[in-house]
């Protein structure tokens, strides 16, 4: 019995946690609540993959990076909601999707340097994390192209390097 959790409850509880974590945040360029982004990413993940861990991670993919929720708090909550192995699998995906090379963590690096290091790091994450990241990039690209065409050029160049790094790593391994 691999999937004991009620699938109807599973993403709903995670979505509620994401809503709580992102409360008060707005999407850049719009008045939409920020949580609409991870919800859309999760919806696309669910449409493409039959993997509820990926759906949960997609809902939570920006929680550690963009909210006050700590790794420990997320781990505790996941363990309250799911069996230990499922909680850890979701947490691992969220950690893989969380930017390491941020301005806060690496203030001495410029944006281009940080994005290159982040792309190189993301090239080595799990296949599931890569699949979520690609959908995240797709959704962000749509928004940026529509709302800030001048920044879109920079954003898309950074993502092109990331996609090349991911492809290169996958071809080597």
Residue locations for each model-derived region?
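Active-site helical microenvironments for divalent-metal-assisted chemistry
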Residues: 1-173
């Amino acid at each position: 019995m691999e999937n004991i959790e009620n699938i109807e409850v599973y993403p709903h509880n995670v979505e509620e946690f994401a809503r709580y974590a992102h409360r008060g945040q707005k999407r850049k360029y719009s008045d939409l609540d920020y949580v609409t982004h991870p919800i859309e990413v999760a919806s696309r993940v669910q449409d493409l993959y039959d993997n509820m861990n990926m759906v949960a991670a997609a809902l939570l993919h920006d929680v550690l990076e963009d909210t006050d929720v700590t790794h420990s708090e997320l781990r505790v909550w996941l363990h309250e909601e799911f069996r230990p192995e499922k909680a850890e699998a979701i947490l691992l995906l969220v950690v893989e999707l969380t930017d390491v090379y941020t301005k806060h963590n690496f203030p001495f690096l410029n944006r281009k340097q940080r994005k290159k290091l982040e792309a190189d790091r993301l090239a080595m994450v799990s296949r599931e994390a890569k699949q979520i990241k690609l959908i995240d990039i797709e959704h962000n690209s749509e928004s940026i192209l529509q709302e800030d065409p001048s920044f879109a050029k920079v954003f898309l160049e950074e993502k092109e390097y990331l996609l090349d790094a991911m492809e290169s790593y996958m071809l080597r391994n």
